[in-house]
Regions:
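Divalent metal-dependent phosphate-bond-processing catalytic cores, especially two-metal-ion Mg2+/Mn2+ enzymes
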Residues: 2-25, 82-118, 130, 159, ...
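Short alpha-helical hairpin
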Residues: 27-56
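Active-site flanking loop/helix segments enriched in acidic
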Residues: 48-79, 133-134
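An active-site-proximal "capping" alpha-helix that borders the catalytic cofactor pocket
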Residues: 73, 142-157
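His-Asp-centered metal-binding catalytic motifs of divalent-metal-dependent phosphohydrolases/nucleases
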Residues: 73, 119-137, 146, 233-239
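Secondary-structure capping and boundary motifs in well-ordered enzyme cores
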Residues: 116-122, 142, 227, 278
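Inter-helical turn/loop segments and adjacent helix faces that build the functional surface
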Residues: 140, 154-166, 208-226
């Protein structure tokens, strides 16, 4: 088994999110007119997954901002859509469309709301996949650069789609005239032979030449602009999470021991279940879920220690001082999570961060002045 295949087994949700996006960006028949060689849907998809996602998120300077970070975010998105959902405002991003709550009310079937209903799920997935696609701890414009790469990806997919559509039309029409059944075969994807399961098999998720296939993004100029601008905007908002105001203020209560609790927002509570959340807020909350991990040791190993590795170019004292200062500033904000569903993590997140600051401060006190 190759290293890439081994990595793929750890990121089934990343693969599923990618497949769901590409199915709305590329036609299932693709012929490369530049080389006059046949390139099927799977080949084109895999080529760009390696180029835009895998190769970037496996760069050596990354320890926390990796494919596993995306996998965790998508796992929380799956749980959110299963337990809460969009109350009919948007098609689900990861859940199957058969979920009853996804049926739109009549007033959402036209205009801008219709575009948002149809395409917000893709915006969420693209934002997750691309929000850290550029990550260099020594530069301050990672978010801006990541947004540019996301736009570049969409432009690339649009060109690929146009090439495939233009070159495939004549070929498919000729085959169709000779044999209608051969036309379907000419667009079929090869069986999966790379060791990945059915979850990752694009041909099973999106059967070839199906008249039930949803239209590609590019057939609607308004939708194309919506996806491009919204995805870039979402990514740019991760530069300063807490500058985005929540829809409603949510409050922690102080426990008898002096800590915080958000027990009033238990799963299934009216506040959680009745909230109609802004997808941007959900996306930003997904990015911060690691802070509220229920196990403090896991928080330390998977987040705090890996962030420290990413900033190993700083001296020990400079890192300890800078990290503690950053977290103290973060803690001053009254509300970290913007949606009631994820606000349930707030008390635990503050506990984890407070303990990290305490550990950083204690270690800094032991560092010789010259370090």
């Amino acid at each position: 088994m190759s290293v890439a295949q081994s990595a793929d087994e750890r990121i089934p949700l990343v693969r599923r999110a990618w497949a769901r996006c590409v199915a709305r960006l590329l036609p299932l028949c693709a012929t490369d007119t530049r080389t006059l060689s046949s390139r099927n849907f799977r080949d084109v998809s895999e080529e760009h997954f390696r180029r835009f996602i895998y190769n970037r998120y496996t760069e050596p300077q990354r320890h926390y901002h990796t494919l596993e970070h995306l996998e965790e975010m998508l796992g929380h998105l799956v749980a959110y859509e299963a337990e809460h959902g969009w109350h009919g405002a948007y098609k689900p991003a990861m859940a199957e469309e058969s979920v009853s709550s996804s049926t739109p009310p009549p007033e959402l079937l036209t205009g801008e709301d219709s575009v948002a209903y149809e395409w917000t799920g893709m915006v969420l997935l693209l934002s997750v996949l691309f929000h850290d696609v550029v990550y260099d701890p020594t530069r301050s414009d990672n978010e801006e650069a990541s947004a540019v790469v996301a736009a570049e990806f969409l432009e690339t997919m649009q060109r690929e789609s146009e090439l495939a559509s233009n070159s495939s039309f004549g070929a498919v029409a000729a085959v169709s005239a000779a044999s209608p059944t051969s036309m379907v075969a000419s667009c079929a994807l090869p069986p999966a032979s790379d060791g990945r399961g059915a979850e990752d098999d694009v041909s099973q998720q999106h059967p070839p030449f199906s008249y039930s296939e949803p239209p590609l993004l590019w057939v609607d100029a308004q939708a194309t602009d919506f996806v491009r601008t919204s995805t870039m905007s979402y990514i740019l908002k991760t530069k300063e999470h807490l500058s985005v105001e929540p829809k409603q203020p949510l409050y922690l209560t102080v426990s008898a021991g002096g800590g915080f609790t958000s027990a009033e927002l238990r799963r299934g509570s009216d506040v959680v279940q009745q909230s109609r959340d802004d997808p941007l807020h959900v996306f930003l909350d997904l990015d911060l879920t690691i802070l509220g991990h229920p196990d403090e040791d896991t928080y330390r190993r998977r987040y705090a220690e890996n962030i420290r590795r990413e900033y190993s170019h700083y001296s020990r004292a400079d890192f300890l001082r800078g990290r503690a200062e950053f977290l103290r500033g973060f803690a001053q904000h009254p509300q970290w999570y913007k949606t009631p569903y994820f606000f349930r993590l707030e008390a635990r997140a503050r506990h984890n961060v407070a303990h990290e600051v305490k550990a950083l401060t204690a270690e800094l006190a032991e560092v010789p002045v010259a370090c």
